[in-house]
Amino acid sequence: MRSNEGNKGVLASLDWFTISLYLILVTWGWFSVCGASYDFINPDIFGWSTNSGKQLVWIGTAIILGSMLLLIEKRFYDTSAYFIYMTMIMLLIVTIIIAPETKGSKSWIPIGPVKLQPAEFAKFAVALTISKLMNTYGFTLANTRQFAQVAALILLPMLLIICQKETGSALVYLSFFLVLYREGMTGAFLFTGFAMIVYFVVGIRFSTEQLSYMPVIVGEFIVHLLISIFTIAMTWVYTRNWQLTRTLALTVIGSTILALLFSAYVIPFNICHVQLIANTAMTITLIVMAFTTRTAKLTFIALFAIISTSFFYASNHVFHKVLQDHQRTRIEVLLGINDDIRRAGYNVNQAKIAIGSGGLTGKGFLNGTQTKLKYVPEQDTDFIFCTVGEEEGFIGSAALLLTYLVFIFRLIHLAERQPDTMGRVYGYSVLCIFLFHLFINVGMVLGLTPVIGIPLPFFSYGGSSLWGFTILLFILLRIDAERNLKRQ
Protein backbone atom coordinates (compact mmCIF):
# COMPACT_ATOMS: atom_id res chain seq x y z
CA MET A 1 0.00 0.00 0.00
CA ARG A 2 2.79 2.38 0.90
CA SER A 3 4.57 1.47 -2.32
CA ASN A 4 1.50 2.38 -4.38
CA GLU A 5 1.10 5.65 -2.49
CA GLY A 6 4.79 6.41 -2.98
CA ASN A 7 4.56 5.77 -6.73
CA LYS A 8 1.50 8.02 -6.98
CA GLY A 9 3.42 10.70 -5.09
CA VAL A 10 6.33 10.43 -7.51
CA LEU A 11 4.00 10.74 -10.51
CA ALA A 12 2.38 13.81 -9.02
CA SER A 13 5.75 15.38 -8.24
CA LEU A 14 7.35 14.79 -11.64
CA ASP A 15 8.25 17.74 -13.84
CA TRP A 16 5.85 16.93 -16.65
CA PHE A 17 6.87 19.99 -18.63
CA THR A 18 10.38 18.55 -19.07
CA ILE A 19 8.95 15.13 -19.89
CA SER A 20 6.75 16.77 -22.54
CA LEU A 21 9.82 18.43 -24.08
CA TYR A 22 11.57 15.05 -24.07
CA LEU A 23 8.67 13.37 -25.89
CA ILE A 24 8.45 16.23 -28.40
CA LEU A 25 12.17 16.04 -29.21
CA VAL A 26 12.19 12.24 -29.42
CA THR A 27 9.15 12.18 -31.73
CA TRP A 28 10.52 15.00 -33.86
CA GLY A 29 13.82 13.16 -34.01
CA TRP A 30 12.15 9.98 -35.24
CA PHE A 31 10.47 11.81 -38.12
CA SER A 32 13.85 13.33 -39.00
CA VAL A 33 15.46 9.87 -39.01
CA CYS A 34 12.64 8.74 -41.31
CA GLY A 35 13.39 11.63 -43.65
CA ALA A 36 17.14 11.03 -43.60
CA SER A 37 17.04 7.26 -44.11
CA TYR A 38 14.00 6.91 -46.38
CA ASP A 39 14.62 4.56 -49.28
CA PHE A 40 12.50 4.69 -52.46
CA ILE A 41 13.17 0.99 -53.07
CA ASN A 42 12.18 -0.04 -49.53
CA PRO A 43 9.64 2.60 -48.40
CA ASP A 44 8.57 0.75 -45.23
CA ILE A 45 9.55 3.13 -42.41
CA PHE A 46 8.45 0.73 -39.65
CA GLY A 47 10.42 -2.37 -40.68
CA TRP A 48 13.38 -3.62 -38.62
CA SER A 49 15.50 -3.52 -41.76
CA THR A 50 15.27 0.28 -41.86
CA ASN A 51 16.93 2.78 -39.54
CA SER A 52 13.59 4.43 -38.82
CA GLY A 53 12.12 1.09 -37.75
CA LYS A 54 15.07 0.37 -35.48
CA GLN A 55 14.93 3.87 -34.03
CA LEU A 56 11.27 3.33 -33.15
CA VAL A 57 12.33 0.30 -31.11
CA TRP A 58 15.08 2.33 -29.40
CA ILE A 59 12.52 5.02 -28.55
CA GLY A 60 10.10 2.49 -27.08
CA THR A 61 12.78 0.83 -24.97
CA ALA A 62 14.13 4.25 -23.91
CA ILE A 63 10.70 5.27 -22.61
CA ILE A 64 10.42 1.99 -20.70
CA LEU A 65 13.94 2.49 -19.32
CA GLY A 66 13.12 6.04 -18.27
CA SER A 67 9.92 4.91 -16.56
CA MET A 68 11.87 2.28 -14.60
CA LEU A 69 14.44 4.87 -13.52
CA LEU A 70 11.66 7.01 -12.06
CA LEU A 71 10.96 4.18 -9.59
CA ILE A 72 14.51 4.16 -8.17
CA GLU A 73 15.01 6.32 -5.11
CA LYS A 74 17.75 8.92 -4.91
CA ARG A 75 19.45 7.15 -2.00
CA PHE A 76 20.27 4.24 -4.31
CA TYR A 77 22.37 6.54 -6.50
CA ASP A 78 23.92 8.07 -3.40
CA THR A 79 25.07 4.70 -2.07
CA SER A 80 25.92 3.08 -5.43
CA ALA A 81 27.59 5.96 -7.29
CA TYR A 82 31.17 4.70 -6.86
CA PHE A 83 30.17 1.12 -7.72
CA ILE A 84 28.43 2.31 -10.90
CA TYR A 85 31.50 4.37 -11.79
CA MET A 86 33.93 1.46 -11.33
CA THR A 87 31.63 -0.82 -13.32
CA MET A 88 31.64 1.62 -16.23
CA ILE A 89 35.42 2.01 -16.03
CA MET A 90 35.81 -1.77 -16.25
CA LEU A 91 33.40 -1.85 -19.19
CA LEU A 92 35.42 0.84 -21.00
CA ILE A 93 38.60 -1.20 -20.46
CA VAL A 94 36.89 -4.37 -21.72
CA THR A 95 35.68 -2.44 -24.77
CA ILE A 96 39.27 -1.54 -25.69
CA ILE A 97 40.20 -5.23 -25.53
CA ILE A 98 37.28 -7.02 -27.21
CA ALA A 99 35.51 -4.46 -29.41
CA PRO A 100 36.00 -4.94 -33.16
CA GLU A 101 37.20 -1.96 -35.16
CA THR A 102 34.32 0.00 -36.65
CA LYS A 103 35.04 3.03 -38.85
CA GLY A 104 38.49 3.41 -37.29
CA SER A 105 37.39 3.15 -33.63
CA LYS A 106 37.03 0.33 -31.11
CA SER A 107 34.12 1.68 -29.12
CA TRP A 108 31.20 -0.60 -29.97
CA ILE A 109 30.42 -3.93 -28.29
CA PRO A 110 28.25 -6.24 -30.45
CA ILE A 111 25.47 -7.94 -28.50
CA GLY A 112 23.46 -10.11 -30.85
CA PRO A 113 21.90 -7.99 -33.61
CA VAL A 114 22.73 -4.68 -31.88
CA LYS A 115 25.84 -2.76 -30.87
CA LEU A 116 26.26 -0.72 -27.70
CA GLN A 117 28.71 2.12 -27.07
CA PRO A 118 29.75 2.18 -23.37
CA ALA A 119 31.13 5.72 -23.73
CA GLU A 120 27.55 7.01 -23.92
CA PHE A 121 26.61 5.35 -20.61
CA ALA A 122 29.77 6.39 -18.77
CA LYS A 123 28.53 10.00 -18.78
CA PHE A 124 25.81 9.41 -16.20
CA ALA A 125 28.27 7.39 -14.08
CA VAL A 126 30.71 10.32 -14.00
CA ALA A 127 27.87 12.76 -13.26
CA LEU A 128 26.66 10.66 -10.33
CA THR A 129 30.14 10.12 -8.92
CA ILE A 130 31.30 13.73 -8.92
CA SER A 131 27.89 14.69 -7.48
CA LYS A 132 28.37 12.17 -4.68
CA LEU A 133 31.95 13.30 -3.98
CA MET A 134 31.16 17.01 -3.98
CA ASN A 135 28.23 16.41 -1.63
CA THR A 136 30.51 15.04 1.12
CA TYR A 137 30.90 17.10 4.27
CA GLY A 138 33.71 19.66 4.11
CA PHE A 139 34.31 19.31 0.37
CA THR A 140 35.65 22.42 -1.35
CA LEU A 141 37.21 22.96 -4.76
CA ALA A 142 39.64 25.37 -3.11
CA ASN A 143 41.35 22.29 -1.66
CA THR A 144 43.90 21.17 -4.25
CA ARG A 145 43.64 17.51 -3.28
CA GLN A 146 39.86 17.44 -3.51
CA PHE A 147 39.90 19.29 -6.83
CA ALA A 148 42.41 16.73 -8.14
CA GLN A 149 40.06 13.91 -7.10
CA VAL A 150 37.19 15.39 -9.11
CA ALA A 151 39.47 16.04 -12.10
CA ALA A 152 40.71 12.42 -11.97
CA LEU A 153 37.15 11.08 -11.96
CA ILE A 154 36.48 13.09 -15.13
CA LEU A 155 39.76 12.46 -16.95
CA LEU A 156 40.03 8.68 -16.37
CA PRO A 157 37.06 7.66 -18.58
CA MET A 158 38.05 10.37 -21.03
CA LEU A 159 41.51 8.82 -21.49
CA LEU A 160 40.03 5.32 -21.86
CA ILE A 161 37.66 6.56 -24.57
CA ILE A 162 40.59 8.19 -26.37
CA CYS A 163 42.28 4.77 -26.29
CA GLN A 164 39.20 3.50 -28.14
CA LYS A 165 40.04 6.05 -30.87
CA GLU A 166 36.79 7.88 -30.16
CA THR A 167 38.16 11.39 -29.65
CA GLY A 168 34.84 13.16 -30.21
CA SER A 169 33.05 11.25 -27.46
CA ALA A 170 36.01 11.84 -25.13
CA LEU A 171 35.89 15.61 -25.60
CA VAL A 172 32.31 15.67 -24.27
CA TYR A 173 33.69 14.91 -20.79
CA LEU A 174 35.42 18.29 -20.72
CA SER A 175 31.97 19.81 -20.24
CA PHE A 176 32.02 18.54 -16.64
CA PHE A 177 34.59 21.22 -15.81
CA LEU A 178 31.90 23.86 -16.47
CA VAL A 179 29.96 22.28 -13.62
CA LEU A 180 32.92 22.87 -11.31
CA TYR A 181 32.87 26.56 -12.22
CA ARG A 182 29.26 26.75 -11.00
CA GLU A 183 30.37 25.15 -7.73
CA GLY A 184 33.05 27.73 -7.00
CA MET A 185 36.04 26.81 -9.13
CA THR A 186 38.13 29.90 -9.82
CA GLY A 187 37.71 31.49 -13.23
CA ALA A 188 41.46 31.13 -13.73
CA PHE A 189 40.90 27.49 -14.68
CA LEU A 190 38.40 28.46 -17.38
CA PHE A 191 40.83 31.09 -18.63
CA THR A 192 43.54 28.43 -18.75
CA GLY A 193 41.26 26.23 -20.84
CA PHE A 194 40.49 29.15 -23.15
CA ALA A 195 44.21 29.89 -23.49
CA MET A 196 44.92 26.27 -24.45
CA ILE A 197 42.32 26.46 -27.23
CA VAL A 198 43.91 29.69 -28.51
CA TYR A 199 47.39 28.11 -28.46
CA PHE A 200 46.16 25.10 -30.39
CA VAL A 201 44.22 27.06 -33.02
CA VAL A 202 46.94 29.67 -33.60
CA GLY A 203 49.76 27.13 -33.51
CA ILE A 204 48.10 24.85 -36.06
CA ARG A 205 46.63 27.57 -38.29
CA PHE A 206 50.01 29.28 -38.82
CA SER A 207 52.23 26.20 -38.51
CA THR A 208 53.32 26.37 -42.15
CA GLU A 209 53.90 30.12 -42.48
CA GLN A 210 57.27 31.80 -41.91
CA LEU A 211 57.88 35.23 -40.44
CA SER A 212 59.19 37.37 -43.31
CA TYR A 213 62.61 36.07 -44.42
CA MET A 214 63.53 34.67 -41.01
CA PRO A 215 63.57 30.95 -40.12
CA VAL A 216 60.68 31.49 -37.71
CA ILE A 217 57.33 29.69 -37.76
CA VAL A 218 54.60 32.30 -37.29
CA GLY A 219 52.39 30.02 -35.19
CA GLU A 220 55.15 29.15 -32.73
CA PHE A 221 56.23 32.80 -32.47
CA ILE A 222 52.69 34.03 -31.71
CA VAL A 223 52.02 31.30 -29.15
CA HIS A 224 55.23 32.06 -27.21
CA LEU A 225 54.33 35.75 -27.30
CA LEU A 226 50.82 35.00 -26.01
CA ILE A 227 52.23 32.87 -23.18
CA SER A 228 54.44 35.80 -22.17
CA ILE A 229 51.57 38.31 -22.31
CA PHE A 230 49.09 36.07 -20.46
CA THR A 231 51.61 35.24 -17.71
CA ILE A 232 52.59 38.87 -17.18
CA ALA A 233 48.94 39.97 -17.17
CA MET A 234 48.06 37.29 -14.58
CA THR A 235 50.97 38.44 -12.42
CA TRP A 236 49.47 41.93 -12.26
CA VAL A 237 45.86 40.77 -11.82
CA TYR A 238 46.59 38.34 -8.98
CA THR A 239 49.41 40.15 -7.13
CA ARG A 240 49.03 43.86 -7.96
CA ASN A 241 52.82 43.97 -7.71
CA TRP A 242 53.67 46.68 -10.24
CA GLN A 243 57.43 46.39 -9.79
CA LEU A 244 57.46 42.64 -10.47
CA THR A 245 55.07 42.99 -13.41
CA ARG A 246 57.13 45.79 -14.97
CA THR A 247 60.39 43.85 -14.54
CA LEU A 248 58.95 40.74 -16.19
CA ALA A 249 57.46 42.75 -19.06
CA LEU A 250 60.65 44.69 -19.79
CA THR A 251 62.79 41.54 -19.62
CA VAL A 252 60.64 39.09 -21.57
CA ILE A 253 59.00 41.37 -24.14
CA GLY A 254 62.19 43.43 -24.46
CA SER A 255 64.35 40.38 -25.21
CA THR A 256 61.82 39.24 -27.81
CA ILE A 257 61.91 42.62 -29.58
CA LEU A 258 65.72 42.72 -29.53
CA ALA A 259 65.93 39.17 -30.90
CA LEU A 260 63.45 40.06 -33.62
CA LEU A 261 65.47 43.11 -34.71
CA PHE A 262 68.77 41.19 -34.59
CA SER A 263 67.32 38.36 -36.69
CA ALA A 264 65.80 40.79 -39.20
CA TYR A 265 68.82 43.06 -39.75
CA VAL A 266 71.94 41.14 -38.64
CA ILE A 267 71.89 37.34 -38.62
CA PRO A 268 68.63 35.48 -39.30
CA PHE A 269 67.90 32.84 -36.64
CA ASN A 270 64.93 31.22 -34.93
CA ILE A 271 63.94 33.76 -32.28
CA CYS A 272 61.50 31.26 -30.76
CA HIS A 273 64.49 29.82 -28.90
CA VAL A 274 65.01 33.21 -27.26
CA GLN A 275 61.31 33.38 -26.41
CA LEU A 276 61.44 29.93 -24.83
CA ILE A 277 64.49 30.86 -22.75
CA ALA A 278 62.90 34.16 -21.67
CA ASN A 279 59.65 32.45 -20.66
CA THR A 280 61.61 29.79 -18.77
CA ALA A 281 63.56 32.47 -16.89
CA MET A 282 60.28 34.24 -16.08
CA THR A 283 58.80 31.01 -14.74
CA ILE A 284 61.84 30.31 -12.56
CA THR A 285 61.65 33.87 -11.20
CA LEU A 286 58.00 33.39 -10.27
CA ILE A 287 58.73 30.08 -8.52
CA VAL A 288 61.63 31.56 -6.52
CA MET A 289 59.53 34.55 -5.46
CA ALA A 290 56.64 32.25 -4.55
CA PHE A 291 58.87 30.41 -2.07
CA THR A 292 60.63 33.49 -0.70
CA THR A 293 57.46 35.54 -0.23
CA ARG A 294 55.18 32.55 0.49
CA THR A 295 52.72 33.70 -2.17
CA ALA A 296 50.68 30.76 -3.45
CA LYS A 297 49.27 32.77 -6.35
CA LEU A 298 52.75 33.13 -7.86
CA THR A 299 53.06 29.34 -7.82
CA PHE A 300 49.81 29.07 -9.76
CA ILE A 301 50.99 31.65 -12.32
CA ALA A 302 54.27 29.79 -12.78
CA LEU A 303 52.32 26.55 -13.20
CA PHE A 304 50.18 28.26 -15.84
CA ALA A 305 53.31 29.19 -17.82
CA ILE A 306 54.67 25.63 -17.56
CA ILE A 307 51.36 24.06 -18.59
CA SER A 308 50.98 26.53 -21.48
CA THR A 309 54.38 25.73 -22.97
CA SER A 310 54.01 21.99 -22.40
CA PHE A 311 50.52 21.98 -23.91
CA PHE A 312 51.64 23.81 -27.04
CA TYR A 313 54.40 21.34 -27.87
CA ALA A 314 52.33 18.33 -26.79
CA SER A 315 49.30 19.38 -28.86
CA ASN A 316 51.53 20.01 -31.85
CA HIS A 317 52.92 16.47 -31.50
CA VAL A 318 49.44 14.98 -31.06
CA PHE A 319 48.10 16.82 -34.10
CA HIS A 320 50.88 15.69 -36.43
CA LYS A 321 51.76 12.28 -34.97
CA VAL A 322 48.77 10.90 -33.04
CA LEU A 323 45.56 12.05 -34.73
CA GLN A 324 44.32 9.95 -37.61
CA ASP A 325 44.46 11.46 -41.09
CA HIS A 326 40.71 12.11 -41.31
CA GLN A 327 40.68 13.80 -37.89
CA ARG A 328 43.64 16.00 -38.76
CA THR A 329 42.12 16.90 -42.12
CA ARG A 330 38.80 17.92 -40.54
CA ILE A 331 40.60 20.40 -38.29
CA GLU A 332 42.60 21.74 -41.24
CA VAL A 333 39.38 22.30 -43.20
CA LEU A 334 37.79 24.13 -40.27
CA LEU A 335 40.83 26.39 -39.83
CA GLY A 336 41.03 27.15 -43.55
CA ILE A 337 44.31 25.29 -44.11
CA ASN A 338 42.68 22.72 -46.38
CA ASP A 339 39.80 23.75 -48.67
CA ASP A 340 39.26 20.40 -50.42
CA ILE A 341 35.47 20.26 -50.58
CA ARG A 342 35.57 17.04 -52.61
CA ARG A 343 37.28 15.06 -49.86
CA ALA A 344 37.99 16.54 -46.44
CA GLY A 345 35.27 19.19 -46.54
CA TYR A 346 32.74 17.13 -48.47
CA ASN A 347 30.46 16.32 -45.51
CA VAL A 348 30.14 19.90 -44.31
CA ASN A 349 29.79 21.30 -47.81
CA GLN A 350 26.94 18.91 -48.67
CA ALA A 351 25.28 19.63 -45.32
CA LYS A 352 25.36 23.36 -46.05
CA ILE A 353 23.87 22.76 -49.50
CA ALA A 354 21.08 20.66 -47.96
CA ILE A 355 20.25 23.28 -45.34
CA GLY A 356 20.40 26.13 -47.85
CA SER A 357 18.17 24.32 -50.33
CA GLY A 358 15.42 24.11 -47.72
CA GLY A 359 14.75 27.82 -47.96
CA LEU A 360 12.26 29.41 -45.58
CA THR A 361 9.67 26.64 -45.21
CA GLY A 362 11.52 23.56 -46.47
CA LYS A 363 10.71 20.95 -49.11
CA GLY A 364 8.35 18.92 -46.96
CA PHE A 365 8.52 15.55 -45.21
CA LEU A 366 10.36 12.91 -47.28
CA ASN A 367 10.92 15.42 -50.11
CA GLY A 368 14.53 16.39 -49.42
CA THR A 369 16.64 15.74 -52.51
CA GLN A 370 20.07 16.04 -50.90
CA THR A 371 19.17 13.58 -48.16
CA LYS A 372 17.12 11.18 -50.29
CA LEU A 373 19.88 10.88 -52.87
CA LYS A 374 22.43 10.24 -50.09
CA TYR A 375 24.64 13.23 -50.88
CA VAL A 376 25.16 13.88 -47.17
CA PRO A 377 27.19 11.17 -45.39
CA GLU A 378 26.01 10.16 -41.88
CA GLN A 379 22.84 12.14 -42.53
CA ASP A 380 20.76 10.22 -39.97
CA THR A 381 23.38 10.34 -37.21
CA ASP A 382 25.93 13.14 -36.89
CA PHE A 383 24.41 15.29 -39.66
CA ILE A 384 20.73 14.83 -38.81
CA PHE A 385 20.28 18.59 -38.41
CA CYS A 386 20.72 19.11 -42.16
CA THR A 387 17.63 16.93 -42.72
CA VAL A 388 15.64 19.33 -40.55
CA GLY A 389 17.01 22.27 -42.52
CA GLU A 390 16.18 20.76 -45.91
CA GLU A 391 12.72 19.34 -45.17
CA GLU A 392 11.48 21.98 -42.71
CA GLY A 393 13.47 25.02 -43.81
CA PHE A 394 14.59 27.96 -41.73
CA ILE A 395 11.32 28.00 -39.78
CA GLY A 396 11.67 24.35 -38.77
CA SER A 397 15.35 24.74 -37.88
CA ALA A 398 14.65 27.84 -35.79
CA ALA A 399 11.74 26.10 -34.07
CA LEU A 400 13.96 23.14 -33.19
CA LEU A 401 16.70 25.34 -31.78
CA LEU A 402 14.09 27.29 -29.81
CA THR A 403 12.76 24.00 -28.38
CA TYR A 404 16.27 23.02 -27.35
CA LEU A 405 16.76 26.46 -25.80
CA VAL A 406 13.62 26.02 -23.69
CA PHE A 407 14.85 22.56 -22.71
CA ILE A 408 18.26 23.95 -21.67
CA PHE A 409 16.70 26.71 -19.57
CA ARG A 410 14.41 24.15 -17.96
CA LEU A 411 17.44 22.08 -16.96
CA ILE A 412 18.99 25.18 -15.38
CA HIS A 413 15.77 25.69 -13.44
CA LEU A 414 15.74 22.06 -12.27
CA ALA A 415 19.39 22.19 -11.21
CA GLU A 416 19.07 25.46 -9.32
CA ARG A 417 16.07 24.39 -7.26
CA GLN A 418 17.77 21.29 -5.80
CA PRO A 419 18.13 21.51 -2.00
CA ASP A 420 21.52 19.78 -1.78
CA THR A 421 24.86 19.80 -3.58
CA MET A 422 24.42 16.33 -5.07
CA GLY A 423 21.19 17.21 -6.86
CA ARG A 424 22.52 20.57 -8.06
CA VAL A 425 25.82 19.16 -9.34
CA TYR A 426 24.08 16.29 -11.10
CA GLY A 427 21.59 18.71 -12.66
CA TYR A 428 24.33 20.94 -14.01
CA SER A 429 26.24 17.89 -15.25
CA VAL A 430 23.22 16.89 -17.33
CA LEU A 431 22.84 20.48 -18.54
CA CYS A 432 26.48 20.83 -19.62
CA ILE A 433 26.48 17.50 -21.47
CA PHE A 434 23.36 18.41 -23.44
CA LEU A 435 24.65 21.92 -24.13
CA PHE A 436 28.01 20.62 -25.38
CA HIS A 437 26.34 18.10 -27.71
CA LEU A 438 23.93 20.69 -29.06
CA PHE A 439 26.55 23.39 -29.66
CA ILE A 440 29.13 21.09 -31.27
CA ASN A 441 26.71 19.05 -33.39
CA VAL A 442 24.88 22.03 -34.89
CA GLY A 443 28.18 23.90 -35.17
CA MET A 444 29.89 21.14 -37.14
CA VAL A 445 26.93 20.84 -39.54
CA LEU A 446 27.20 24.59 -40.20
CA GLY A 447 31.00 24.43 -40.49
CA LEU A 448 31.59 26.42 -37.30
CA THR A 449 33.20 23.63 -35.25
CA PRO A 450 35.31 20.58 -36.16
CA VAL A 451 33.51 17.43 -37.30
CA ILE A 452 34.15 15.21 -34.27
CA GLY A 453 31.21 12.86 -34.65
CA ILE A 454 28.91 13.39 -31.67
CA PRO A 455 25.12 12.93 -31.86
CA LEU A 456 22.36 15.52 -31.57
CA PRO A 457 20.44 14.68 -28.34
CA PHE A 458 17.20 12.71 -28.95
CA PHE A 459 17.51 13.27 -32.71
CA SER A 460 20.44 11.29 -34.09
CA TYR A 461 19.87 7.66 -35.00
CA GLY A 462 21.26 5.17 -32.51
CA GLY A 463 20.19 3.29 -29.41
CA SER A 464 23.25 3.95 -27.27
CA SER A 465 23.05 7.74 -27.51
CA LEU A 466 19.27 7.80 -27.01
CA TRP A 467 19.45 5.51 -23.99
CA GLY A 468 22.40 7.44 -22.58
CA PHE A 469 20.60 10.79 -22.83
CA THR A 470 17.40 9.24 -21.44
CA ILE A 471 19.24 7.83 -18.41
CA LEU A 472 20.85 11.20 -17.72
CA LEU A 473 17.56 13.07 -17.89
CA PHE A 474 15.29 10.65 -16.03
CA ILE A 475 17.65 10.23 -13.09
CA LEU A 476 17.52 14.02 -12.74
CA LEU A 477 13.72 13.95 -12.96
CA ARG A 478 13.56 11.37 -10.16
CA ILE A 479 15.94 13.40 -7.98
CA ASP A 480 13.82 16.50 -8.59
CA ALA A 481 10.59 14.62 -7.85
CA GLU A 482 12.02 13.47 -4.52
CA ARG A 483 12.65 17.10 -3.62
CA ASN A 484 8.94 17.75 -4.04
CA LEU A 485 8.03 14.64 -2.02
CA LYS A 486 10.15 15.81 0.93
CA ARG A 487 8.57 19.25 0.76
CA GLN A 488 5.13 17.67 0.92
Predicted segments with their positions:
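Alpha-helical transmembrane segments of integral membrane proteins, especially early/N-terminal helices
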Residues: 14-24, 82-84, 88, 353-363
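Short hydrophobic beta-strand that contains or immediately precedes a catalytic carboxylate
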Residues: 116, 350, 458-459
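TM-adjacent membrane-interface loops and short helices in multi-pass inner/ER membrane proteins
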Residues: 330-384, 392-396
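Hydrophobic alpha-helical transmembrane segments of multi-pass inner membrane proteins, especially
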Residues: 21-35, 39-342, 386-444, 471, ...
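Short, Lys/Arg-rich, polar N-terminal cytosolic tail immediately upstream
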Residues: 1-11
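Transmembrane alpha-helices of multi-pass inner-membrane enzymes
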Residues: 230-234, 447-484, 488
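Helix-boundary and loop/linker segments of multi-pass membrane transporters
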Residues: 10-11, 146-147, 373-376, 418-419
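Transmembrane helix boundary and interhelical junction motifs in multipass membrane proteins
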Residues: 166-171, 363-368, 379-381, 452, ...
